[in-house]
A protein has these predicted regions:
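Active-site His/Glu-centered metal-binding helix of metallohydrolases
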Residues: 45, 157-158
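Alpha-helical structural signal
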Residues: 16, 23, 61-64, 83, ...
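Phosphate-binding glycine-rich loop
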Residues: 29-78, 92-103, 168
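PLP-dependent aminotransferase-like
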Residues: 69-157, 164
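Generic alpha-helical secondary structure signal
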Residues: 14, 18-22, 36, 40, ...
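N-terminal "arm"/small-domain region of PLP-dependent enzymes with the aminotransferase-like
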Residues: 1-31, 36
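Solvent-exposed, non-membrane alpha-helical residues enriched in polar/charged side chains
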Residues: 20, 24, 42-46, 65-69, ...
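Short beta-strand segments
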Residues: 5-7, 58, 130
Length: 168
């Protein structure tokens, strides 16, 4: 017996015609990266997130790399994260030229804020918590630690888009 993990055909059946129409439109005008659909997505996603701007990139990996580089993270720096995530949460740190420092997770499988301060060194530049399975990390505790030590925080939300934390 074969039981599919996720039946994507069934899941998308109700909107199949709309999906085909949208894909056909993009294929016809050929603007895969900078077309009006991307601009519309950015506008709507920014509104959904309650921010002024959103920038669509080719991957979450590149988004994290750009965020780290924009903050000046590079060679000789350390970034605290967790190891129980997709490879991007670590590879982005390496691609930025820094060293990932792992802290363990709590019973909720999310970054354990109680372990962060023990991992901080003079080379620590940022904390990269990974929100996972639709659940956000304890951001109040993480932000308090970051503020105390003057560290940047880059949140990997790829697995928890639109997740709420304390009503936000």
């Amino acid at each position: 017996m074969n039981i599919p993990y996720v039946d994507l055909a069934e899941q998308h059946a109700p909107i199949k015609e709309k999906l085909l129409e949208a894909v056909s439109k993009v294929l016809d005008h050929g603007k895969f990266v900078s077309g009006e659909e991307v601009a519309e997505f950015e506008r709507r996603f920014a509104k959904l997130c309650g921010v002024q701007y959103a920038v669509a990139l080719n991957s979450g990996t590149d988004a994290l790399i750009l965020a780290l580089k924009a903050l000046g993270v590079g060679s000789g720096d350390e970034v605290i994260t967790v190891s129980n995530s997709f490879v991007s949460s670590t590879s982005c740190i390496v691609c930025a030229g820094a060293k990932p420092i792992f802290v363990d997770v709590g019973e909720d499988y999310l970054m354990d804020p109680a372990l962060i301060e023990k991992a901080i060194t003079p080379r620590t530049k940022a904390i990269l918590p990974v929100h996972w399975t639709g659940r956000p990390c304890d951001m109040a505790a993480i932000m308090a630690i970051a503020k105390k030590h003057k560290l940047a925080v880059i949140e990997d939300c790829a697995q928890a888009v639109c997740a709420e934390y304390r009503g936000q």
